[in-house]
């Protein structure tokens, strides 16, 4: 059983949790962390980029109120996934049944948490989710700011990526010691019928780019190759050297995101391998 010291000190002043009290303690923890969070679990995703893995949608009340994408480019607010998100909001399972489903996943099963929605906003629920995962590889991204909580989740084998709004923000988030991903211009996505060679040429020869403070950014491989998250798993583990993964703006609101990024904050300089750099062309 995973222990929650802050709760144990409140319920058991001696700091000890006797075996006869386990059921009672779990009930108290459930009461203390009760929220209206709802979830939809898809056992085998049909998402082309994810691949055939389990995925979870969390209700919209898990999203931070200050998320910059709220109404300003969040892909989950429109399109087919918005219908599934509404299903989670209206008729999704509650938190405890979700945890039971996660515990039943195969031992080494990669899965995706939060194709819409975010992590539980309270730390106790976050750590219960992390404990239920039991060290499985998982794809998790958050716009939340409970950085100490995410470190604790990481220690339980629940690897959390924090999402940056632009590359300057990515530099700030990198100082937390957590894995970072960042939204970048849709120019970094390979265009339909564009060859890989032409794509590389358009971006200056190499795909590697840099933040203002010199941290390495690489585009999500699924944005320019036929790979899937199941094949890649780059975001499911810590990345050597703190490499930041860039996700090109996508979805029906990508132009809106590009406009927000038009100040250049998410158009990092491209390393041509010749000691110089160029800027990708401006978004249309």
Where do the model's predicted regions map?
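Class I S-adenosyl-L-methionine
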Residues: 2-284
